[in-house]
Amino acid sequence: MSQANITTLTLRIDWSELDLFGHVNNVAFMKYVQAARVNYWEQIGLYKYYTERKHGPMLASTYCEFKKPLFYPGDIMIHSQMEFIKNSSFGIVHQIYNSHEELAAEAKDVMVMYDFISLIKMPFPEDIKKLVSI
């Protein structure tokens, strides 16, 4: 991941996120990715864009590849970055690191820009595209 346009979110692992085997459940990883996704939207202005215009991202797909288990107690750090921008869709890659700075998982989201009033997809906003120039 290059250093351009990366956001970082640090979260504390909660004991309730553990599964029968004593490590963080896969569902919790997706919760972490959701938090990182929204944090990224806020940082690049997409959340504000939605609140002002009711135009915003809608999740089309999400994927996570697990590399190492996570354990309690501990913190995680999630680095998120724009992977691609097409006409109306875009992708974000998230890298989840454990307390030892080891890559625990990599997740990818594909989203579609959506007009929540007209209920149709729409082009990715040019002003935000310039901010994240990939």
Give residue spans per PLM region:
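HotDog/MaoC-like acyl-thioester-processing domains
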Residues: 3-9, 70-72, 83-134
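Hydrophobic beta-strand-centered segment that forms part of the acyl-chain substrate-binding groove
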Residues: 40-90, 104, 112
